[in-house]
Amino acid sequence: MRNLKKVFSTPDDKEYFFGYYDKSPLNYKNNKILAHAVGFNDRIPDKNDFCDLGFFDLSQPDTFNKLSTTSTFNWQQGSMLQWLGPDHTQKIIFNDVDSYGKKFISKILDIDTSEEKILPFPIYSVDLLGKNAFSIDFERHYWFRRGYAYAGIKNKKKSEYFDPHDGILILNLESGSSKKIISLAELIELNRVSSMHKAAHYIEHVMPNKSGTKIAFLHRWKFETGIHARLIVSDIDGADMKIINDSGRISHFNWRNNSEIIAWGASVNPFNSMRKFSSLNKFIIKPLLPIYKKVIGRNSLQGNSKISSLISGDSYLRIDINSGKNSSFGKD
């Protein structure tokens, strides 16, 4: 691509990574990049693994400036490491486990003074002002989404498929107080369908909008024939809950502004709607699926589909928001 300039490359001594796409490793001054540093990359982290946290200063890009360590991280989202608002320059926040190894916590760290504040809960996301954070039950998440969970606490009491008390918490970063705003029990009663029965329910990707007045999140459940996901939006107190996409196939999304969301997913159609119902899945969709695959061809790969007989490399799409037209670039 034209007009690209190499800023820095990570050293070869460790494996460096950041985390999920919804958080930026860059501070607001665009001169420091946050990173995790570990000594392996060939397995899922376990409870005995530690990860260094720090940053690269772009004026001295060859040096990793270590700030802290954590044993609470995964490959997908790291330790939820991020710059803390409102300035997104002076302080960072990340997840860890307490000194007894019994409870997940989060820490706020001043990168200049090393002053540390310990909060009695882990965080999933933080609003841009650095006022409120949002969280889920990470102990329970371990049993259903291992790649997005933490290995530090293996609580078998949280392995039940359904826990009506699980849900989303709002966390006040100043006072350290927390309050449940949405429960799994409420989510199941929101347009309840038969596939929810005896399914493993969990919540992921809780994201506040730009002003911190609303959150968007995914409610997922694993049932006999697959996983159904729906995108839901609510006020930060849990009020005015609305299902935005109920196609069953919705994953990566982000707030474009305070009232618009851009997302990868499927559109709602009769076929996707049938997947929510256990009997239709068992007696209609599952028997017909092999025929459907044969008709559309085994060599068809689009978007985030499963690989059949072709392997597709990475490429990027440039999408015009107004026209919907797209073009690819940066292909392998």
Predicted region positions:
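Asp-box/WD-like beta-propeller blade repeats and closely related beta-sheet repeat scaffolds
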Residues: T70-P86, K91-G167, K180-H197
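Hydrophobic beta-strand positions that form the internal "hydrophobic ladder"
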Residues: N30-L34, I92-I93, A133, I215, ...
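Residue-level detector of Asp-centered blade-edge/turn motifs that repeat once per structural unit
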Residues: Y28-K29, G85-H88, L128-L129, K210-S211, ...
